[in-house]
Amino acid sequence: LGPDGKRGRQTYTRYQTLELEKEFHFNRYLTRRRAVEIAHALCLTERQIKIWFQNRRMKWKKEHKDESQAPTAVPEDAVPSVSTAADKADEEEEEEEEEEEEEEE
């Protein structure tokens, strides 16, 4: 901990970064079980994995910001996706945590 009570910035090895990026390529969101597996495999904490993914999603969002503003054609026979209240709660919790992490940096 530094004089301000915050932890220092985590640096990841090339191997850890490569593995995290590889996982992110296939899934932008992790299940808790998968986060535990990755944390164990990379000798990191679940919290470090969670925060890395939150930060990486924000980076991805910024990189793809322009793409999402372009009008997209939706086929007339497209079926709207169905999300449960639990999914919505999880998404809101993730967004709140991302905002908290950004404030900490």
Swiss-Prot record:
Signal peptide: none annotated. The keyword Transferase does not apply. The keyword Metal-binding does not apply. GO terms for molecular function: DNA binding; DNA-binding transcription activator activity, RNA polymerase II-specific; DNA-binding transcription factor activity; DNA-binding transcription factor binding; RNA polymerase II cis-regulatory region sequence-specific DNA binding; sequence-specific DNA binding; sequence-specific double-stranded DNA binding. Transmembrane segments: none annotated. GO terms for biological process: angiogenesis; anterior/posterior pattern specification; embryonic skeletal system morphogenesis; negative regulation of cell-matrix adhesion; negative regulation of DNA-templated transcription; negative regulation of keratinocyte differentiation; negative regulation of leukocyte migration; negative regulation of monocyte differentiation. Its main location: nucleus. Residues 5-64 bind DNA. Pfam families: Homeodomain. InterPro entries: Antp_homeobox, HD, HD_metazoa, Homeobox_CS, Homeodomain-like_sf. Residues 62-105 are annotated as: Disordered. It is found in: Nucleus. Belongs to the Antp homeobox family. Sequence-specific transcription factor which is part of a developmental regulatory system that provides cells with specific positional identities on the anterior-posterior axis. This is Homeobox protein Hox-A7.
